[in-house]
Amino acid sequence: MADGCVIKRKSYVFEVTLKSEDAYILEAFLQDAKGTYSIKDKVVKYKNNNVIYKRLIISDSEFCRNLIKQGVVPNKSLIANPPLLDDKYKRHFIRGLLDGDGHYSKSRRRITLTTTYNLLKYVLQAFNADISLIHLKNNIAYFDISKNYYLIIIYLYFNAHYYINRKRESIFAVLHRYGKDM
């Protein structure tokens, strides 16, 4: 839900765009899905520089209809609601949401998530942890996690196969700083 969108053209298409260094996620997805689509470069102008991203476009109406049922719709960032998932998939969804629209502080146990209020509630309920909401403005939620930080990281990353490596490394650096290693 974080870095992908469904677009209505002549038919529905699903597009996901990631930093070039994270393209391995797209490759793993295609391999597991046994997809024949290709990953292409997308050049984006950023601060007077051309930045190359990797983009996957899937033109499959049934696939797109299933995503729409789960809330992946145009302009979803403004209206996103939690998907209807079995409990065994919630942590994977939340990890993907945080990988795409979240930030893990390198200096303290803080997570920042840019999302709707309904999705934020969903995440906080899944964590069931001692969390203080610091700020919620313009769909940006900052929250500190104190004593349950380690348990939340285990919940998100234990036996996980898909994640953004650079985000995981950032989290593990914080854990190491606090004397907790996985």
Question: Positions of the model-derived regions?
Answer:
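Internal intein/HINT superfamily modules and their associated LAGLIDADG
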Residues: 1-182
